Amino acid sequence: MGEVTAEQVEKFLDSNIIFAKQYYNLRYRAKVISDMLGAKEAAVDFSNYHSLSSVEESEIIFDLLRDFQENLQAERCIFNVMKKLCFLLQADRMSLFMYRVRNGIAELATRLFNVHKDAVLEECLVAPDSEIVFPLDMGVVGHVAHSKKIANVVNTEEDEHFCDFVDTLTEYQTKNILASPIMNGKDVVAVIMAVNKVDEPHFTKRDEEILLKYLNFANLIMKVYHLSYLHNCETRRGQILLWSGSKVFEELTDIERQFHKALYTVRAFLNCDRYSVGLLDMTKQKEFFDVWPVLMGEAPPYSGPRTPDGREINFYKVIDYILHGKEDIKVIPNPPPDHWALVSGLPTYVAQNGLICNIMNAPAEDFFAFQKEPLDESGWMIKNVLSMPIVNKKEEIVGVATFYNRKDGKPFDEMDETLMESLAQFLGWSVLNPDTYESMNRLENRKDIFQDMVKYHVKCDNEEIQKILKTREVYGKEPWECEEEELAEILQGELPDAEKYEINKFHFSDLPLTELELVKCGIQMYYELKVVDKFHIPQEALVRFMYSLSKGYRRITYHNWRHGFNVGQTMFSLLVTGKLKRYFTDLEALAMVTAAFCHDIDHRGTNNLYQMKSQNPLAKLHGSSILERHHLEFGKTLLRDESLNIFQNLNRRQHEHAIHMMDIAIIATDLALYFKKRTMFQKIVDQSKTYETQQEWTQYMMLEQTRKEIVMAMMMTACDLSAITKPWEVQSKVALLVAAEFWEQGDLERTVLQQNPIPMMDRNKADELPKLQVGFIDFVCTFVYKEFSRFHEEITPMLDGITNNRKEWKALADEYDTKMKALEEEKQKQQTAKQGAAGDQPGGNPSPAGGAPASKSCCIQ
């Protein structure tokens, strides 16, 4: 029998299919399956392209399944699939493009590039900073992702979707392409692409079938990976919300501590190297003294970026959480614009637009200027950034959270955005807690303050008003039963004569008058201004208001009703005698005099600093100008009472303007604001000298409300300090009253606060009063009256008064210095004599001639 050839055996088996199947199952099936399952690699020759038998293809499939079972890394599994596909499709190269959404825009980025049958994973894995990114409207892969259909490009030169920029970048020529989307349900997850069919002009229909068949493995791998990733993200998000929620409800009082506790607690779940939180200033409206320089043209208006609700973007604090290397937290109050977390401009941009920004390659970013060098000694550099706004329930941006460098080196993806956004959104909503607490605390403080006011102050009652409006004695009825003409007749007989009492003079002294007489003088000023009839002020309300004001001032050493009246009297004198009334309307004059009378009502005899140190409810209620705002609120509280409201017959516009003028006037008495406004006032005075006629200047002044407000604010300061301008016999007494009140505060600081007071408030340094007075006159007071005397020469008597008083205080200060110098010289003489006597005593140690004095602690026998 001759030798049987392979062709004959193959022909026999093809003709006897049943026999071939029985023979294979009996002899080889168990061994093949056993060998296949036990093998570490498929027994297929990949060294050159060739057609595969069904057994070899089965081995490839089993190899892919085993790899999928044993390998948890999605990139490696997909890489193995692509290597096999390269061989099966006889493609020169394959690449994988991952679908993602960045800043709301879909795109494709290379994850595995230039995979071939002999490739190594590490060479094909694309680093985040080396990605090639395709938008969906560009290239064949973009078209595939957009259409969600397989694409077989026979000739790239004739295809409208082909883009050659990758060929130009890699110096490679793409002739034909076979690409298909990898789907998860209806969503595109990635696009896989094979290029350049080997030994054939293009990919065939058979290649499309092979690709789709083996793509099931890629689909399965990506789906499992995607579901695993989603599960991980949702788990992290749940943990973040759970832990941040626990810390949010632990801290209900302060937004900064609330954010800090929540963000620090969830740091392990954020999957980044570093993150920072910038807190925004929530101030929407500036104080008038900050607006004046802009309105006066002395400072340019703010032209920088603003939040969507119109606030100036000002990060008042940045909290930096460092998670790489040694963990650390840095809190930067009032960070400079060049701080590393702000210098790029990204947080400002996010605060301005309210958008989430995902920067995947920070060093290559053109729009934002990130630092390209290491930030610290550890060599840490910014690679990718995710920044988003923190928005409260009112849709106001309260801060910006920025996360740097995902830990696995990849850029932040859509799920990271969702996770971080959940945290930022939760923190934004949680701001409602400290806001509500602050509102409740504010109401509680108001309640405490008003309870204290009610205990101490009582408005003018029906018995007290009879001391001035003697309606029972004259008409036998109550004031509210009388006509206005009847009340006017009574007041005409009761109120003092303005000329006789000199209430319009700068040298007026309250010392000879009783407090009731001062109330009557105050009422008379309203008649002198001719505002009672013009604005239909009820005369009963006027009397009750002035009497209540006198009771509203506490019985303290200096800041009592007498001081309040003196400030009102000086305001009246400046308007009438100083001729400043020409710049103001009658309504404004009414508001200014009323504000002057109210300016220190319910003063406690201690200053603003003491309120803060003692943690007085006032300090918690008012952030700045603490006492001044309290005086203002107290005065407005009296005016809200119908029986005391002298503004009750003003129309709405007049009432709002009068209250506005009072707001500015009373707050302007805070000396802390004095140095802000005096330069502006000086420029107004200088400008007044450039006008030829008084009428032209007056018309110019009345055109601009801001100029009038600045003058009024400086008038309030001049009124508040006016005691320093009184005749010496009056001023010297008042100065002692001021000093006595200061010393009382110093005593409180010693006993209550356990602190040493400043020299001005130290009773033990009372002898230095003349020197302190001279310093106060030079540093604070002289400027006011010198400028007012330049502004209006009618006010010169006030400057003369302060000049004379300075001479008196200077003489006393010099006398004190002379006495102290004499005492010091006498003391030195006594010490010298005592040392000389000690040197002559037996056992003493006299110093040699011209030598040092003998030691006080050592004696040689």
From Swiss-Prot:
Name the domain of life.
Answer: Eukaryota
Q: Using the record's annotation, list all stretches that form the GAF domain.
A: 73-222, 254-431
A GO biological-process term: cAMP-mediated signaling
Q: What is its main location?
A: membrane
Q: Name one GO cellular component term.
A: photoreceptor outer segment membrane
The family database entries (CDD domains) matched by this protein are listed as:
HDc (cd00077)
Lipid tethering residues (S-farnesyl cysteine): C858
Identify the cofactor(s).
a divalent metal cation
Give the compositionally biased regions (Low complexity). 830-861
Chemical reaction(s) catalysed: 3',5'-cyclic GMP + H2O = GMP + H(+)
Question: Which positions does the record annotate as the modified residue N-acetylglycine?
Answer: G2
Residues in domain PDEase?
A: 483-816
Question: What are the protein's GO molecular function terms?
Answer: 3',5'-cyclic-AMP phosphodiesterase activity; 3',5'-cyclic-GMP phosphodiesterase activity; metal ion binding
Propiece residues: 859-861
A Pfam cross-reference name: PDEase_I
- Residues that bind a divalent metal cation 1: H563, H599, D600, D720
Listed A to Z, the keywords are:
Acetylation, Cell membrane, Cell projection, cGMP, Hydrolase, Lipoprotein, Membrane, Metal-binding, Methylation, Prenylation, Repeat, Sensory transduction, Vision
- Give its E.C. classification number: 3.1.4.35
Which residues does the entry assign to the active site, renumbered to this chain?
H559
Which InterPro entries does the annotation name?
Answer: GAF, GAF-like_dom_sf, HD/PDEase_dom, PDEase, PDEase_catalytic_dom, PDEase_catalytic_dom_sf, PDEase_CS
Membrane protein topology class:
Lipid-anchor
Per the entry, the cofactor note is: Binds 2 divalent metal cations per subunit. Site 1 may preferentially bind zinc ions, while site 2 has a preference for magnesium and/or manganese ions.
| UniProt xrefs under PANTHER family | CYCLIC NUCLEOTIDE PHOSPHODIESTERASE
- State what this protein does: Rod-specific cGMP phosphodiesterase that catalyzes the hydrolysis of 3',5'-cyclic GMP. This protein participates in processes of transmission and amplification of the visual signal.
Q: What is this protein called?
A: Rod cGMP-specific 3',5'-cyclic phosphodiesterase subunit alpha
Q: Which organism is it from?
A: Canis lupus familiaris
Q: What is the lineage of its organism?
A: Eukaryota, Metazoa, Chordata, Craniata, Vertebrata
